[in-house]
Amino acid sequence: MFSFRSPPFPRNSHSSPPLKPLLCLSLSLSLSLSLAHTPAHPPLLFPSIVPMDPSSADVVAHDFPPFFKVYKDGRVERYKMFNNDGPSPAGDDPATGVRSKDIVILPDTGVSARIWLPRIDDCRGRKLPVLVHYHGGGFCAGSPFDPIGQRFFTTMVPKANVIAIDVDYRLGPENPLPTAHEDSSEALKWLASHSGGHGPEPWINEHADLNRVFLIGESAGANIAHYVAVRAGSTGLTGLKIVGSIIAHPFFGGKEPDKMIMFMYPGSPGTDEDPLLNPAVDPDLPKMAGERVLVCVAENDWLMPRGVKYYETLRDGPWKGEVELDEAKGEDHCFHMFKRNERAEQLLQRMADFINRE
């Protein structure tokens, strides 16, 4: 197993205490969820799997590879998805001058974040755009403290010259959906509390231009970023201005029920009939905050059709902003988070240009 948390914030580990509430759903989810699940699609974020050591004789009640399985006694165990050296510590990156630190932003729920700041010489005396990031991982994996995030932000922060906030929302299945979405929305309210330079985080007070806020997410995180933009617009959030969103390789629902989503999201059909999984059926879509959206898809990604559909929904629907589509030929799901090839660099530059466009 691998840990999803950095040492200051050990909220979710690879094996958790018994998951009593979700086991109570077994009657409503019935036989189909009681069987080991073989997904009809590849993982939402991670491209490779390191098998678990099958040393336990415990009975598995629900199995959702490559993400997690739930034992009959309610314990949750996560699959080891890739080899890494554990969480990357916050601090100064000597190669880029990018600084980072970890903070708790919602003490009542334990939601934390990692904040990234470009080289001080590049931001002294002026305010920077704010990039709020929601990581991918099927709503049940990933963390701002993983090495993946460090590689991305030490490249993206100086390239776009932004202050970035990577939100550590609570994960399923221990925290059923839409907890991840609600945590992420509350994190944006926390950011808005810095309006006027009087918030709890000095880096934001000193360096953040809250009139230039951008949301970004990949895979499940892209779903969350969209949700946060819609929620901000529909509730009239004050204290900041969302200029745009970057929706990369988004996960949205399809025609067939997604059993893992159904397990983590009680009451959801797990299909495109659910507004949380399909923006086209969300009555609040016209109120989505932001002037522009960049939708990123990859040619070899099984989710590409859903990303294109999202682009078409914004382009042809009642939302009145500007939407762009970027298709990466020959690439797969979330390649820009794992690779540093020419196409990944081009996509990150496209994102930076999108943020800094006047």
Features from the language model and the residues they span:
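Aromatic (phenylalanine/tyrosine) cluster motif
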Residues: 2-4, 9, 46
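Prokaryotic Sec-type signal peptides and long signal-anchor helices
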Residues: 6-8, 13, 239, 358
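Intrinsically disordered, low-complexity terminal segments enriched in Ser/Thr
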Residues: 13-18, 24-46
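Alpha/beta-hydrolase superfamily serine-hydrolase fold, recognizing
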Residues: 50-358
